[in-house]
Amino acid sequence: MEHQSYREILREIALDNYGYVTTQDALEIGVPPGELAKLAHRKKGLLRNVSYGLYRDESVPEDPRGYSHIAEAVLRAGRGSYIHGESVLALHQLALVNPRYIYVASPRPARPSLPTHIKLSKAKAGAKITEYEGIPSQTVTNAIFECRKKIEPQRLEEAARKARRQGLILLNEWAKIEKELDL
């Protein structure tokens, strides 16, 4: 087996995470957390400290769909965090929603240093979480229900129908949506 440098190992993680590496990710695969800080300091332009415990590998290109920014928002909020509501609909291009903000739910208290485009809320106990495109997310069905008072009914119905056509909503979930949204 070929020996990999810490840099190579961290790049592998970053390639799977839209260019991002957390100190926790590094620790889990045997890279001492201090190595990230050393690489960020020493190797200018390769690894950049984004926030506490979060680094970006600058050799990994930004995702052209904008998913890198969404992944960063979730990672900044910490483990167990996920996108919800309008951000889930925006991720799938299901409805015209405000892309200026990324809505993230977190089980932990807010970090004071979050950028203003990240809107953090307390995660609901027992929330059903999944992953879309490798990004932790509320289910599309629950995002539709959450957006009932934020998006006009006709646009929300259109989003639900589009999600169903794309296979993002299961048949049993669709029955619940039809009943709840009176479709």
What is each residue range found by the language model?
Residues 1-80, 112-117, 174-175, 180-183:
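Short beta-edge/loop segments at beta->alpha junctions of small alpha/beta modules
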Residues 27, 90, 164-165:
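Short polybasic/polar patches that bind polyanions
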Residues 34, 65, 80-83, 139, ...:
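Generic recognition of short, well-ordered alpha-helical interface segments
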Residues 43-45, 93, 167:
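Short glycine-centered helix-capping/turn motifs at secondary-structure transition points
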Residues 67-72, 89, 122-128:
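Short acidic (Asp/Glu) patches
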Residues 72-76, 86-91, 139-149:
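Short, hydrophobic/amphipathic alpha-helical patches that form generic packing surfaces
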Residues 76-103, 107-108:
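Short helix-loop-helix/strand-helix junction enriched in hydrophobic and basic residues
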Residues 97, 101-104, 108-111, 120-183:
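Hydrophobic alpha-helical interaction segments
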